[in-house]
Amino acid sequence: DTLRIFVLGESAAMGTPEPAFGFSRILERLLHHRYPDQAFEVINLAMRGINSHMIRRIAMEAAVYEPDLVIVYAGNNELVGWQAPEPDQAPLRPLKMIRAQQALLSTRLGQWLWQRIRPFKDEWNQEQDMAFFRKHHLSAKDPRREEVLSRFAGNMSEALEVFVVQRVPVLVGSVLVNERDFPPLGFPSSSEATPLNDPLFALPWWQACEGGDREWLEEQLP
């Protein structure tokens, strides 16, 4: 019998920038090589630009196909992305409203209506380049971060629960972060304390920049 493995996640799980070299393809080749007498199907259900709100829906639909193993690698798009907080937005959109929109868009009638009533310029359909991410970065002290983390935990719990009740094994991977070569996208505004005045930030920052040009770095900060 064929063993079916589902991969859930976002662009990193999909294999961006080239899905042909994503870890799901590599995993499938490794399994075929290690167990030549066993048939495997590694099905990548990841998508670029989504987050746990969508992963929850995908998981519920995927569970119907009774996979033998599920691999989840997600968490990159919670603070910047669809339904994420924006710097100039006050409260987060109510969770019930998000759920209602998703339910509506799961129907053909809802999709037809959405195409006609949504704004002509949908910002989240634009290219998400570095300028986009710099525009949407949030302060480390933004209180909405806690709500985002709470929603992420809730969404993932519901997504995993549908497989747990079916006794399907689930592997959940931590999101990798390249802290050495990928500095913060931005710094607090002038109305807030600068990073170098924050003792929780300053020490690890300078330690990470050891060997660099400290004077040049100071000139770049607000």
Q: Predicted segments — roles?
A:
Residues D1-Y35:
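Membrane/wall-proximal cationic-aromatic binding patches
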Residues T2-R4, Q38-E41, Y65-V70, V164-L171:
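Loop/turn elements at helix/coil->beta-strand transitions in domains of secreted/extracellular proteins
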Residues L8-G9, L45-R48, Y73-G75, G173-L176:
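Active-site-proximal beta-strand/loop segments in catalytic clefts of secreted hydrolases
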Residues S11-E18, N44-L45, D142-L149:
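Second-shell loop/turn segments in exported
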Residues M14-P17, S52, V80-G81, D181:
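Short, solvent-exposed loop/turn elements at domain surfaces
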Residues D37, G75-P222:
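Serine-dependent acyl-ester chemistry module
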Residues V42, R48-A59:
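Structural motif
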Residues I55-L69:
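Short, well-structured alpha-helical segments in soluble
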